[in-house]
UniProtKB/Swiss-Prot annotation:
It comes from the Bacteria. It is found in: Cytoplasm. Keywords: Chaperone, Cytoplasm, RNA-binding. It comes from Salmonella newport (strain SL254). GO terms for cellular component: cytosol. Pfam families: ProQ, ProQ_C. The keyword Transport does not apply. This is RNA chaperone ProQ. PANTHER family: RNA CHAPERONE PROQ (PTHR38106:SF1). One of its GO terms (biological process) is post-transcriptional regulation of gene expression. Residues 117-136, 146-175 have a biased composition (Basic and acidic residues).
Amino acid sequence: MENQPKLNSSKEVIAFLAERFPHCFSAEGEARPLKIGIFQDLVERVGGEMNLSKTQLRSALRLYTSSWRYLYGVKPGATRVDLDGNSCGELEEQHVEHARKQLEEAKARVQAQRAEQQAKKREAAAAAGEKEDAPRRERKPRPVARRKEGAERKPRADKPTTKAPRAPREEKHTPVSDISVLTVGQSLKVKAGNNAMDATVLEITKDGVRVQLNSGMSLIVRAEHLVF
């Protein structure tokens, strides 16, 4: 019996399942909610194929169902599917609420990681600035030439000491002309008067774009109020 190739990562297992059961799993785009108990169905249908173990299948399912694209698919009115794409009933409200909380927690973790990275960059920039501001080696003053007796000192012309203040640099933003180019999870800014607030795309609807501000508040905004 020939040795079958082995899948080494959960992503490879998901790609295999998407090819093996295209009406149930997807490798990209919004995912469909899975039937409850689908793990046992997988063990029965693909057990032994590609040298897959139960542990690999369980890890791949955990990664698949915790991804943002899967959690976005768990919404009111959606139906669960089995391995062949057959409907297995509409989602319960408690499952939709659980998925919503998981998605919010995942986004909060990403924002915390970004804030930590930005803080490290600021610390590194500050450290580099301190090195540049280190005192330089003091130069010895040149000896002053003696004036001849009777020579008069010429008055120096006064130099202007004040400089015209620079105009504050206006931050430039690129308006969002087409919301179809946006993707879920993308970072942009929402215009509010003369200010622009950081936000993250949650959903693209026919009425506009649903975004979440750094404060945690979510709202639907029209394209003319969005900039990069």
